[in-house]
Structure formats: structure tokens, C-alpha cells
Amino acid sequence: MTFYNQIVDKGRLKKLISWAYRNYGAARSSQVADNLKDLGFRYATKAGVSISIDDLTVPPTKRGMLDSAEKEINITEARYARGEITEVERFQKVIDTWNSTSEELKDEVVRNFRQTDPLNSVYMMAFSGARGNMSQVRQLVGMRGLMADPQGQIIDQPIKTNFREGLTVTEYVISSYGARKGLVDTALRTADSGYLTRRLVDVSQDVIVREIDCGTRRGLKVTAMKDGDRVKIALGDRLLGRVLAEDVMVGDEVIASRNQSIDAALAAKIGKSVESVMVRSPLTCEAARSVCRCCYGWSLATGRPVDLGEAVGIIAAQSIGEPGTQLTMRTFHTGGVFTGEVAEQIKAPDHGTVKWGKGLSTRKVRTRHGEDAFQVELAGDLIWTPTGSGKKMTYSVTPGSVLFAADGDTVEKDKMLAEVTAAKSTRSTERATKDVSTDLAGEVFFANLIAEEKTDRQGNTTHIAQRGGLVWVLSGEVYNLPPGAEPVVSNGDEVAEGTVLAETKLISVNGGVVRYQPQSREIDIITASVLLDQAEVRKESTGGHEQYVIYTADGQRFLLKATPETKVQNHAIIAELIDDRYQTTTGGMLRYGGIEVAKGSRKTGYEVVQGGTLLWVPEETHEVNKDISLLVVEDGQYVEAGTEVVKDIFCQCSGAIEVVQKNDILREIIIKPGEFHLDVDPDEVSYKNEDLIPPGTEVLPGVVTTDLRQVEWIESTEGLGLLLRPVEEYPVSNEPAAPSQGSINEEEVGRHIELRSVQRLFYKDGERVKSVDGIHLLSTQLVLEIETGSEQAAANLAADIELKNDEEEDCQRLQLVILESLILRRDLDTDPHGGTITTSVLVTDGDQIAPGAVVAKTEIQCREEGEVRGIRRGLEAVRRVLIVRDEDLEIITLKEKPTVAKDDLIVAGTEFAPGVVAAESGLVVAVNQGEEGYEIKLRLARPYRVSPGAILHIADGDLVQRGDNLVLLVYERAKTGDIIQGLPRIEELLEARKPKEACVLSRKPGVCQVEYLEDESVDVKVIEDDGTVSEYPILLNQNVIVSDNQRVDVGEHLTDGPANPHELLEVFFDYYVDKKGVYEAALIGLQAAQKFLVDQVQSVYQSQGIDISDKHIEVIVRQMTAKVRVDDGGDTTMLPGELVELRQIEQVNEAMAITGGAPARYTPVLLGITKASLNTDSFISAASFQETTRVLTEAAIEGKSDWLRGLKENVIIGRLIPAGTGFNAHEEMVMGTLDNGEDSLNNRYGQGERDNNNSDKKPPNRLIGATLDEVDENMILDDNIARAYTEADPPWSVESKQEKDDDDDK
């Protein structure tokens, strides 16, 4: 046993047990674990470690650290107030300051514990890995730190207290957002993670170790995994449990040979001596439909080569899916907080000077905190020389680093010299915006700011700051004027309190009689009205509902159609005459006699223009719609009244029958009354159908008409007959009578209102009306007519219907009035910036006013005295007025002559004269010289810095209220690492989705030319090796990460952002297909995509501190990259668009090459895990996953067979699964091939005799019996020995096994 003398924490414990297991097998290590457990419990019991509140000690230096942070922030705030930095830069600086303070405090907490109380229970728990971690301890005894608001934006006030000190109410509320978010998140995460595992299992369930060695010479190049300069996974850790694909040479010495498996010692040795190693990998394994033992390497459960029949696919799926719950799912946008882990900071060790080395070229930049600095374009050295004696220091700076000291500058101790950005790290930026609102009301003034108009495709114009500059807001009280108010003062007027600034007049357009109740909000003006002065209105109720009836003086009754107290439009029907003169008893045919109607519609009726007679030929119509067999009479038959014509239907009058039928369905029966004459010779009668015969005419010999008749010839059952149908006449007058009405009309306005009487017919000339009970032919209506100068105006006018009480006769009369309603605005007092508002009404009830008269006026009065400014009379109405009050001005008296002049804008801190400094920013209004000296009048103001490209919400000279938005600053912010993390990113990768903002990849190798254009866009060209120049369009929000004259390789990133794996595959395939042929190019392309996916998935898990072995991810990625899409089948049987395994199509193509047929052409494809699952060979497995119906119908149509190779299809059918012991069936088929190569392989693994697949080499039987007798029950059996204790030979020997195979074959 080796002796360890160090503190054993959780990680150490893991290592200890793993060491015991590796060297002494499972039985011994389980006993070690058991003993450790006893030891642990014994000491835990003795120690009784628990946390009491006294254990939470806050480091004493905390106060000082917070003070220095606040001091730094105050300096920043002052710079912001002076307009030196923008809102964004202030925010960034505040956030960064608090972030670094929080980090320093965390380190201080650890230091404090270590030095003062190393046996502190909190410290022991957190650092032994028992419970809790640093970030939790920090919240207990450090500071809670910055929190995000519900939108994910960081709040720039951190929680400075910790849980030991306790939170204030505000802090508690702020901190509870994050807490709730965490709970919700965990719930969502579990579900997502479970679904991911399910998909992974489905895609990889049929990956089983089926062979010992596929014999491939291919391999995967493994290097340490880095992010910039930081090593995420060391090379040694990545190699553990892999098998080498090539010998590893150090100089001339071979330190490890091909096909050797790498244990911990060898891994460490290789990791120290070489940078990269070729290893066997599931990705390059050539075993058909499985993975071979050499390519997979160790089974991580046992630390030995994997057994045959091991279901490595399922192990891989669970290894990737299970930690999914630990990944943070929804990532919080941290509002641009960017911790300084990317940039390494160089601080001056002491007082000294800075020199730039040769070849260092820079350009001026403004840092994200608004400081001027230099960005390195070509790398070089930064040399620091101490002022006194001391050693020179040389720092190498990379392109993209920021220098804070110019060449030759003298620097203080701890001054920041540079921020060196790590070599290409996965740092990306995004565009973000921030609103800047004003802190005071006043007048906007642009200083050195040029606004430019941009119009987008939709025609919206935005104003953008072309160059950066300052927006000043000059202080003053701003009054919002209500709509329609006109200012009555001008710029420069001096006003006192109560002076009227503006007034709104309420004007009547038409004039008329005023109706006004005091305290009401409306003033109505009657411009025209009409009264039915002779008629009275009574309320009657018929059939359960009430209605109004108008009784006129001459005895007519009109039914009121419009409800009182409502508005009606022009030409609306107000009332309808109640009369039954035009009521028929049956249906029939209508003919006009001399009547003319205006155009109209069936709904509203046709208005009678010229009177005359309505002629009505009655007939009785029954709509039946029954089977023809129910008909009792025949077509043309003459029946008497009361006859049954169809079963259960009787006619009401005598007449000739007409039957209308269609497809043996009886549609309708018509009974036409009249005199029916048979045995008539048609040649003797000169009348045709529908002719009208006047009274007293002899139609037939002996038949004379007594009244008006209409002729109709009928084919009856007894022959041809003549029917003389009666015709009823209804006279219609030219002008219907209208009731008497008196009206007041405004003649000047040209408005006239009256009720006109109109007659309307509802049926056209010659129309047949089907009815049994009769219809109403004509109705008389009262219609509202409003006449104005123009037709357009009349259409929009409406009249109010009112019932007016007549005092003398004690009844109600109908009155229609046209009102002009004017609303008094009494709600204006609610606007805090509106000034004092008074409204006065200038009319009383019953006044007669002329058009254009002012009815009421509202005055806006000034609240304080001052001078009027900011009225710009132009095209638009004046909406705001500014008053410069005394409190907006500051008077400064000086003895000496000031250095400032009138109209100068000065920021706080500027000198007016030697020794006199401005306390506030402002505009110099006047400089006066008096007897005592000079007097400067300063109008207070606030400058706001605007960065280039910001969107301006205001124009020069606008008036703004406090809190109005001035500009929208557009800035780039670093995406924090956590945005592209967690489950969503894993899912995006494994489903092979295209990322939202993919980066641009170079399609061929060459040299870059990068050009930054005027409009902030970047032009990137690559001059390829054959001289071709290709352009790469760069979108606005993409950042170029290559520099001018940099050499790029095929598939290299030109801009930031995640790569699109599909594009990566395509780029490599297109580049190599002409050089190396389709198969090789497909392999290279797929390998590039595979490497990308494995590394990306690893980096997500690594960033969360989860270790997963590469081989698991490789098994899954192998399934995603196994297929190609056929483009052209050639002479093979494959169809275009079919997905086929790469190896399969290549075998077919090799056969084609031998027979001379045309090979199939194909493109490699990358399938997401869901797609790959649905495209497996086994349709049973695919159908049990998703889209069952589609998969099964397709399989049935195509006549597929399922070879039951995977686990899932066998489980569904209920067979033994081909993994573990069930694998023997498969093993027997390949047994013959294993016999010869067995020894060498097992010895190569250093296992020889104790290989668990070696079934033939068994010790003789008697050894087992003899040994077992001596086994002591207290003896600990080691695995390695236990393997020798195999059971007695199975019932069948090797020969019998052979016979069994023969039987199977039969």
C-alpha cells in the first residue's frame, strides 16, 4: 500500500478508490471503500461538524473594498455627468467594477478562512467537496453581487450585503427574481433532458461491440482541448483508455506502439512528451454496423478492454443524456457583463516608463469604458523600465490587445498597461441597444453632432448620429399644451405667475340654439329641427312587445320604426303607415299598370315615382318537396275548393292545377282560380297567353267577361282548355299624404331637414310570388331628408329622434333635431406638466348663436415667473412651451475677467477664471461687467455623450420633459460565455440544426484581404492559391476575426459565431472531391464535421464542469455521419435522394468498377439524431420512436425486411437481445475467424489467460474442485484470481459445439 500524506477531499477520495480498483480489483476496492466509510462516519460523529451563525465570518476588509469600488464608480458617474462617456460606457464600467470587486472579495473570503480559521466548518464543507461551492459561500459571507432583472438585464446596483448581514427589503425583492427563475428552470430542465436521452438511446441502441479488431489503419488525431490559451482537457486525460493507431515516437524512441491500450501511467508519459497522438476511434472504425473492440478501447466501467457483446451505444447515450439535468438550460442574458477572464491584465509593477517594441503597430480605439487606448494590429513587445534601479520587463502583446499607455508614457504603480486578449478564444459579440433618457426638462441643443437621415425599405426615416458628439439639454420648465391650444406669448416675453401662455377655443361651426346644463361636459347646438306638430305619439303594446304609434290629424296611423333617443342617418325610414288596402289573400302574379318606379333593391323596396294601378292575378302555391307518389290529382286537372291535392294538403280555392316536379320529387303545386272552358278551338280565339281582357268582352261564343280577366291556355286531362283568371286592381296615388310638420332650419348654413312621405313596392313588374296566405304589395313610409350644400356632407349627417312633451295638449310629439356636440375638456388638470388650466363657458342655455361663434375657451396659465423660450412657429402646431425660471439660472460673481464668453457651453469642472471652477454644467447666457467685478449668468444644462451610429429620437431645438428618451445607443457587447451553452446548445448540435447566426467559412485556402469601408461594413476577399479572388459577403452583425494578409485554410472561420456543421461538411467535400475522389472527400468532410461536433459538445459539458469521455460522443456522432445521399444511381439499383450507408455504397461502387458499370454519385450528409433514428435500417425501431404510421406505411409499400440487429427491435418482438450473454448467437458465427488471432490480441492487451472472451483455454476441471475446498470464508477474492475460478466445462465440448452449428445450418 502506498502512503499518501495529504488532505483527502472528494476528488482525492475518487482517485484513491480508482487506484485501488485498478490495481487490486473489485473485491479489494469494495472493502477499502467500506473501511473508508467506517472511518468517515467515526470522525464525522466525533467532530459533529455543523454550521452555526458564528461560523459565518465576514472578512474585515470588505468595507474598504466596497468603499474603493464606490469611489471608482463615483468618478465614472462624474465623467458621465460631464458628457465624457456615454450611458453604455458608464453602465459597462459600473458592472465591471462591481464584478471585479465581487471576485476580489471572494478571494479575500478564502484567504481570510485559510489564515484565521482553517477548521471553520463552512470552509471545510465547501473545500472538501462535501457540500456547497465557492459561489454559495461567497453569498453567505462575501456579497451577493449583481443581479439580473426579469428581462435578464443586469441591475447596476449590486446587492452589497450577504446573507450573514441580512438583506434590506429592496435587496430581497431584487434577489427573489433569480431564485424563482432557478426553480422554474430545474423543472423544465428535467423534462428536456429526459427527451434528449430518449432520442440518443434510439439513435445508438444498435451499436454493439461485435468484432475484436476491424484492422483499420485510420485513426483520429487527438490534441489537448483548449479555449484560447486555457487548457480545458489535457491530452493525457483524453487518451486514457484509448488504443493507439500509430506508434508514438519521441525522437527515435518508440514509447508506445500501435494497437497498445493506454493506461494512466502511459497517458501521463505521452501527455508530457508529445502534442498530438493518432488513436483508434469509433468514428474511424470499419466494422460493419458496429464498433470493434480495438477502436472502442476500454470499458470505462471496468478499466479493461470492452467485452464483446457490450451495448456501447446505450452506455454512450446515457453518459451524454444523464448530465443533461446538470446543464443550465435557459441561459440568462447577463446584459453585457463580461468577466475579465478573456483578457489578461498587465499592471505596472512599479513607477516607470513604457516603451513600444519594434514592429508594434496600433490604431486608436475607445475602450468599452469610454477611455482612449490603442488597439494592437501587428503583434510586438511592450517594454516597461523602472524609474530607479530594477529589472526591465518585456510583455508580448497579441493582435487585438488593448494598450492603455502610449509610447514613452510615465506610469504609476499598479496602473493598467494593457489587456492582452487570449489567442483566438470563442468570444463573440452581438449588437445591443440602450435608451438614454433625460434627467431634466428643457430644450435640446446639439453640440458638434451631425444627424443624418436614413430611409429603410418600408419608407420609415430614422435620424442617426453620423459622428459622436454631445446632446445638451438646457434646463427650463416645459409646459405641454393640450391639442388645439395656440400660444398667446412669443419668445423672449417675460411672464409672471398666472399669465396666460396659450388658449384653446371651442367654436361652433354651424350656429343655432344652445342647449347646455351647467357642470355637464357637453354643449349641444341645435342647427336644424323638425316637429310633427299635429300628430301625437302613443306607446302601445302588442304581442308582448312595446311600440310607438303616431296618430296624425287626418286619422292616419304610422308605426315608429326608429327608437327614440337614438341617432338616425340621412334617408333612414322613421315610420311606416299602418294600412291593409294593399294586402292580398293568396300568392300570385303582379303587373304594373302605368306605374313607374325608381331603381332599388328587394331589401329596401322600389320607390314609386309615377302613380297608377297595380294588377294582381291571384294563384295559390303550395311548396311540397315530397315524393311524387303522394300526388292525388293530375297536372291540368280542375279542382273545387277543399279538394285534397297531395296527401294531407287541401286547396283553398277552385282552379286548374299545375304540378312542378324534378327527378320524381314533387316540388310545388299551383292552383290557378278562374273560369275553365273546354272544347275550345284555338283558331277561333284571337287571345294569347297572359293577355288582359277588359270587362264586357265576348271571348267565346256566349261567354262575356264581367270584370278584368287574364287569358291562359291549359293542357288538361280532357284536352286543351281556356282559363279566364280574375285580376284584382289596386290604385296607387302620385303623392302620398304626409303629416303636418313645423321646423326651424338654419338658412345661412344651407341646412334643411324634413320628413318626406314615400311609397315603396316590394315586387317587380311581372314577378310571381309564391304564397298561401297572401302578401303586402305596397307600403307608405316617412323618410328623413337632410339637405346641405353638398351630397357628401349630407351622407355623414345624423339626426337625433326625440319625443317632446306638449304642455297644452298633454301629449307627446315627435321631433328630429340635428345637433352639433362640443365636448368641454375638463380632464386637463391630470397632466403634471400642463400648467394651471381654467375653462370658461361663454354661452347659456337657449342662446341663439351665429356660425363661428366661440362657445367656450380654455386658458393655460403659467405657474412661475420667467422668460418664454422654445416656441418654433412652423408647419406643425406648437405642442410645448418652455419657461426659463430663476432656478434654471445660476449667477457667478468674479473679481477677474472670465475666460468664457456668451453662448459658451461649459461642463462641470471647467475654469471660469484662474481658481474658479464651474460646479455645474451649463450655457453662458450673459457676461456682465459691474462695479464689483464680473457677473456670469449660467443657464444650467446636462450634456449627454452620443456614440456614432446612435439613433436620435429628438431634433435640435426640441423641448423635452424629464424622462423622455433622447437617443438609442447602438453598441456591440461581448456575448458572455453562457449564452451559447446548456441543453439548448447540446440539442442544436446533436440535432445538427443550423445556428441562428452562423459564421462565414473560407471555401478554399488562400490569403485574406480585409478592408474596413466608410459605412462601417467590412469587405473580405480571399486570394486563393491559383490566383482566383473570391469575395465573402459579411452581414452587419458579424465580426471579422481574420486580419489583413492572414493566411487561411479551407473551412477556417472568417467571422465570429458558431459554425454550421452542414456547411463545414459541404466546404471540405467540395474542396477535396476533385483532388481525392468522392469516397476520400466524403471521409475527409465527415471527419471535419465529426471533429467539430465532438469538440463542441465537449466544450459545452466542460464549461459546466462535467467530464464525459470523448468515446461516448464519438459513438453518437458516428451514427449521425454514417449516411450519404445518392445524387445519381449510375448503373446501381440505388435511387436519387436515397440515404445509404457510405461503406455500403462504396462496396457497390467497387463492384461496379470491376464489372465496368457506371458508379453511383453521392454527397455526404449530416443527420440530426431524430432524423438518424427515423432512417435506421430497422423499421421496427424507427416506428417505435416517432411518426409510427408514416414509417410503417413506407416500410410496407417498399416491402422492407427487418434483420433484427439492434436491441430495440428484439425487445419489441420479445426475442433474446443480441447483447451481453445473448450475443453468443452472433459470436458463434464469427467463432471460426477468431481462433487464430486470439493469442496475439490478448497478450497485446496484457491479458492473455484471463481474457473473459477466451472460452477455450480453461484450466482442468480438478483444479477448481481442489482449490475450492481450501477457500477460507474470510479470504478476500480478487477479480484477477476469481477469473481463474471458472465453472466446469459446459455440457457441450468444442466438438459438440461444432455439431450444434451444423444442426443450425440444416
From Swiss-Prot:
Protein name from the UniProt record: DNA-directed RNA polymerase subunit beta'
NCBIfam families xrefs: PRK02597.1, rpoC2_cyan
UniProt EC number: 2.7.7.6
Family classification: Belongs to the RNA polymerase beta' chain family. RpoC2 subfamily.
Residues at which Zn(2+) binds: 214, 285, 292, 295
Domain of life of the organism encoding this protein: Bacteria
Quaternary organization: In cyanobacteria the RNAP catalytic core is composed of 2 alpha, 1 beta, 1 beta', 1 gamma and 1 omega subunit. When a sigma factor is associated with the core the holoenzyme is formed, which can initiate transcription.
Organism taxonomic ancestry: Bacteria, Bacillati, Cyanobacteriota, Cyanophyceae, Oscillatoriophycideae
InterPro entries per the UniProt record, alphabetical: DNA-dir_RpoC2_beta_pp, DNA-dir_RpoC_beta_prime, RNA_pol_Rpb1_3, RNA_pol_Rpb1_3_sf, RNA_pol_Rpb1_4, RNA_pol_Rpb1_5, Rpb1_funnel_sf
Organism: Crocosphaera subtropica (strain ATCC 51142 / BH68)
